[in-house]
Amino acid sequence: MLTVDCLFDVPRHQLKNYPNANMFVTKTAGIWVPISTADFLDAAMQVSKGLIALGVKAGDRVAVASNNRVEWNVLDIAVQQVGAILVPLYPNISESDYRFILNDAGVEICVVSNQELADKITHIRAEVPTLKYLFSFDQLPNCPHWSDIEANKGSVEQHEVEERMKAVKATDLATIIYTSGTTGNPKGVMLSHANILSTVAACIDPIPADKNSKVLSFLPVCHIYERMLHYLYMYIGCSIHFAESMDTIGDNIREVKPDVFSAVPRLIEKVFDKIMAKGEELSGIKKALFYWAVDVAEAYDVVGKSPFYKVKLGIARKLIFSKWQEALGGNVKAIASG
């Protein structure tokens, strides 16, 4: 059972129980740069103050269209702390989808990651009457930087944010996540703090990670699956490393050596197909050992196996599976897929 009621309590739980100097780690100019739990929470608090100064009220909608980056998570917590609702947007959808979602949700503030997305929102901004502010995580010549939110905080004090936080209930709406709209206009899925935290609670035990674990994040955090896992990782004190891009996942896995990462089933299928293709190229005793190990793996279950099976599994891990694990950084204990 979790000991928090709202999503913004999750990083505070980490600070109290597992303060982490490497809460989030981002590769910048070839160097992995961390942010600590304390600094993360301070950044979120300053943004919350700025949002209040901009007139954001409980229940207002703030949108974000961005790749995975620590600023996304800071904004997420900052928005929740003032009782507002985050509307995450995929960075690769059309202008017409942006227009529909921003209007449907009644978004007042939108934060994007780069010039391409700033241009998309700018093109349709006149058709979104509720949209008051547009900011960018990147420094752009024609769009205010998101640090302006904090800069506008004026005389807003921390106790004002804390009062907002106290007013938020577990059953309050935390986010509206829109479907892809492949069969019509996108549809908003309304999720409360309790909705998401119940999933976190259900997934904690199966994930073999703790405060000493490193995870790699590359699935879009705007999707509820990866976002839920971020809250889970934060709750148990993991270090979350962001992959540079989908093209660098292999390199980043070897650099970070994660204990856990999440992936979609199709990606795992591709990895499995490559492994099986390599096995088919073997001959003699090596090929026989390979397929024997595959048979052992297919009989695997987390509980209920005999001591004899555990001996076979230990041999298979030493002779065969250790090489597969090494290709995934050497420390992988689980790949979360759903």
Each PLM stretch: what is its role?
Residues 19-22, 136, 155-178, 185, ...:
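Conserved pre-ATP/AMP-binding loop-to-beta segment of ANL
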Residues 116-170, 275-323:
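ANL superfamily adenylate-forming
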Residues 34-38, 174-200:
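Conserved AMP-binding A3 loop
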Residues 91-123, 199-216, 246-260, 326-327:
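Conserved ATP-dependent adenylate/AMP-binding module captured primarily in the ANL superfamily
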Residues 23-77, 94-99, 147-154, 193:
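Conserved AMP-binding/adenylate-forming core of the ANL superfamily
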Residues 197-214, 221-321, 331:
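Conserved AMP-binding/adenylation subdomain of ANL enzymes
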Residues 61, 67-87, 91-95, 103-109, ...:
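A short helix-loop-beta submotif of the ANL/AMP-binding
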Residues 54, 77, 81-150:
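Structural core segment of the AMP-binding/adenylate-forming
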